[in-house]
């Protein structure tokens, strides 16, 4: 709400993992869970909280794990940033928003979780393989 109060032309985006409902709430008006599931923890509520009800979201996207995880893996390999799946989802959403808006826009997102919390899933090649998720070559068995 505060961003829009300061600049009405700001575009606010929201990302949700598969199986969550906020994307549907902002795009369809009902908080119905999307198809699928996600291994990414700590994101994707299935009820509308007061702060969400007041949000002025312009673009909402559902991001699946196969789209999000490569961003988290690339940031670790190329930038030395060990981030979690929520950060990967946020980056994937920022990329989608950038594609939607086109050139000449500034996109800001939040990288909000450390990857070391998810070692048993995010950095476990056996787990990723069992879930049919991408495994970076540097993590392969």
Where are these regions (language model features)?
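Surface-exposed amphipathic alpha-helices with a cationic face
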Residues: 1-7, 98
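Short glycine/serine/threonine-rich phosphate/pyrophosphate-binding segments
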Residues: 1, 22, 86-94
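Phosphate-binding loop/pocket of nucleotide- and phosphate-handling active sites
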Residues: 37, 92-141
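A short, small-residue-rich loop immediately preceding and capping a beta-strand
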Residues: 81-87, 108-111
């Amino acid at each position: 709400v505060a961003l829009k109060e300061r600049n009405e032309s700001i575009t606010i985006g929201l990302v949700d993992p598969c199986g969550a409902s906020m994307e549907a709430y902002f795009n369809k008006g009902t908080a119905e869970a999307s198809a699928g599931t996600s291994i990414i923890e700590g994101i994707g509520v299935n009820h509308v909280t007061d702060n969400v009800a007041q949000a002025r979201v312009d673009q909402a996207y559902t991001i699946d794990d196969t789209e999000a995880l490569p961003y988290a893996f690339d940031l670790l390999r190329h930038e030395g940033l060990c981030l979690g799946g929520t950060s990967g989802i946020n980056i994937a959403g920022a990329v989608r928003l950038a594609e939607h808006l086109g050139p000449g826009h500034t996109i800001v997102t939040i990288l909000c979780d450390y990857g070391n919390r998810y070692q048993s899933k995010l950095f476990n090649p056996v787990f990723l393989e069992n879930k049919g998720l991408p495994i970076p070559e540097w993590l392969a068995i």
